[in-house]
């Protein structure tokens, strides 16, 4: 029932060639495809295992809630989800919105097909019995993302004449701010949505990195501070 680490080690070979080819046309290299699918699989696999643990060991529910409150329900994450941050049709925007789908502030209209992605993941969680089955759902999500990523743009090297495909307009600069010329960096002029200060944007970037490390197993799910333990006990009672 728990993660199949042998399957995860061979992830690169499990991804069908067509996905590499489609992603290349969008400007993504092979190593980027592996990384993206891995992140999506981590999220789906976490949801699968959470459901398994909640079902078979309900006493752990408060423990898990305490951990997720710490990494997935911080104030800066809540505010960012309500803002216009991470609303470009690029990888950074989609993964931020996807890994925070369970947050009550999640805006399913922030990106194309986000509502469809949520339904795809959560309508299947209860029936997933293995890492491979979770992988197939992650691939289905990646298929949707590829349909929404902008087409890549061919660029020719002036010296060598070599042609490469780079990511098209609408990609993120790494901080979730759109670079597609929409004239709005942080949503301050977009329907009264909350703005993030420069300091909050740095906090947000740090919070997202911690979320990804958490899903990747780099942050121990066993290490709880006394404060976290108290929060867990409060939820359990």
Describe each PLM feature range.
Residues 1-237:
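Short, functionally important secondary-structure microenvironments
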């Amino acid at each position: 029932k728990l993660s199949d680490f042998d399957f995860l080690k061979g992830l690169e070979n499990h991804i069908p060639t067509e996905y590499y080819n489609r992603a290349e046309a969008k400007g993504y290299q092979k190593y980027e495809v592996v990384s993206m699918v891995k992140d999506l699989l981590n999220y789906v696999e976490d949801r699968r295992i959470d459901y398994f643990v909640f079902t078979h060991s309900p006493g752990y529910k408060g423990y898990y809630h305490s951990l997720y409150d710490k990494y997935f329900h911080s104030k800066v994450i809540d505010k960012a989800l309500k803002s216009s941050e991470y609303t470009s049709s690029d990888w950074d925007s989609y993964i931020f919105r996807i890994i925070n789908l369970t947050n009550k502030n999640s805006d399913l209209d922030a990106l194309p097909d986000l509502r469809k992605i949520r339904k795809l993941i959560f309508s299947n969680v209860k029936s997933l019995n293995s890492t491979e089955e979770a992988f197939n759902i992650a691939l289905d999500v990646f298929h949707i993302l590829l349909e929404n990523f902008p087409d890549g743009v061919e660029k020719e090297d002036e010296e060598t004449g070599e042609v490469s495909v780079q990511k098209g307009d609408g990609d993120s600069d790494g901080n979730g701010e759109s670079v597609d010329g929409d004239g709005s960096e942080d949503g301050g002029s977009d329907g009264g949505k909350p703005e993030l200060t420069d300091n909050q944007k740095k906090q947000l970037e740090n919070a997202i990195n911690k979320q990804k490390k958490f899903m990747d197993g780099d942050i121990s799910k066993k290490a709880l501070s006394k404060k976290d333990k108290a929060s867990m006990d409060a939820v359990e009672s």
